[in-house]
C-alpha cells in the first residue's frame, strides 16, 4: 500500500474513533468519495443498520447531473440524503468525513444536508 493510502486509512480510523466517543447514540452520516461519484449513508452503529442512503448514481439524480464528481452532484446528494433521513425519522446525526478533508465536495455535501434539515 502506498503512503498516501496508509495516511488516509489512519485518518479514517482516527475520525471514526472520535465519532464513536461523541455520538451519544446518534446515527453516523458517512461519506465515501471516489474519483467519479460520491456516496453517503446514515448508519445506526448500535443496530448495525443503514437507515438512509444516497449517491450520485441514484436514478433520481443521475439524469440531471453532468457528472457525479463535482460540487453540484455533492449538493444534490446531500439534499437527497437529508430528505430520506427525515423520512426515516432521523434529524440528528454525527458527520463522518471518513478521513477526507472538510473542503470541496465533502463540504458541499455537508452544507446541503444541513440545509435539508439534518442537524450536526
Swiss-Prot record:
Any one GO biological process: translation
Highest taxon listed in the record's lineage: Bacteria
Cited SUPFAM superfamilies: Translational machinery components
Entry keywords, A to Z: Ribonucleoprotein, Ribosomal protein, RNA-binding, rRNA-binding
Pfam family, any one: Ribosomal_L18p
Entry's Gene Ontology cellular component terms: cytosolic large ribosomal subunit
Single annotated GO MF: 5S rRNA binding
Assembly mode: Part of the 50S ribosomal subunit; part of the 5S rRNA/L5/L18/L25 subcomplex. Contacts the 5S and 23S rRNAs.
The family this protein is said to belong to: Belongs to the universal ribosomal protein uL18 family.
Known function: This is one of the proteins that bind and probably mediate the attachment of the 5S RNA into the large ribosomal subunit, where it forms part of the central protuberance.
Protein name: Large ribosomal subunit protein uL18
Species of origin: Methylorubrum extorquens (strain PA1)
Gene that specifies this protein: rplR
Amino acid at each position: 500500500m502506498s503512503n498516501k493510502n496508509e495516511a488516509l486509512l489512519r485518518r479514517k480510523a482516527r475520525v471514526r474513533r472520535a465519532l464513536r466517543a461523541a455520538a451519544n447514540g446518534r446515527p453516523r452520516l458517512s461519506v465515501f468519495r471516489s474519483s467519479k461519484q460520491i456516496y453517503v449513508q446514515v448508519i445506526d452503529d448500535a443496530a448495525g443498520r443503514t437507515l438512509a442512503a444516497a449517491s450520485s448514481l441514484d436514478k433520481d439524480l443521475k439524469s440531471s447531473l453532468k457528472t457525479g464528481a463535482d460540487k453540484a452532484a455533492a449538493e444534490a446528494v446531500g439534499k437527497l440524503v437529508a430528505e430520506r433521513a427525515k423520512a426515516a425519522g432521523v434529524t440528528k446525526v454525527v458527520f463522518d468525513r471518513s478521513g477526507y478533508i472538510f473542503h470541496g465536495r465533502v463540504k458541499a455535501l455537508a452544507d446541503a444536508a444541513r440545509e435539508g434539515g439534518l442537524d450536526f
